[in-house]
């Protein structure tokens, strides 16, 4: 799954 941190990092 995609973590919130991963989305926020982009």
UniProtKB/Swiss-Prot annotation:
Lineage: superkingdom: Eukaryota
Keyword Cell membrane: no
GO CC, alphabetical: extracellular region
Keywords, in A-Z order: Cell wall, Disulfide bond, Secreted
Main location group: secreted
Intracellular or extracellular location(s): Secreted, Cell wall
Family listed: Belongs to the thaumatin family.
Name of the molecule in the record: Thaumatin-like protein 3
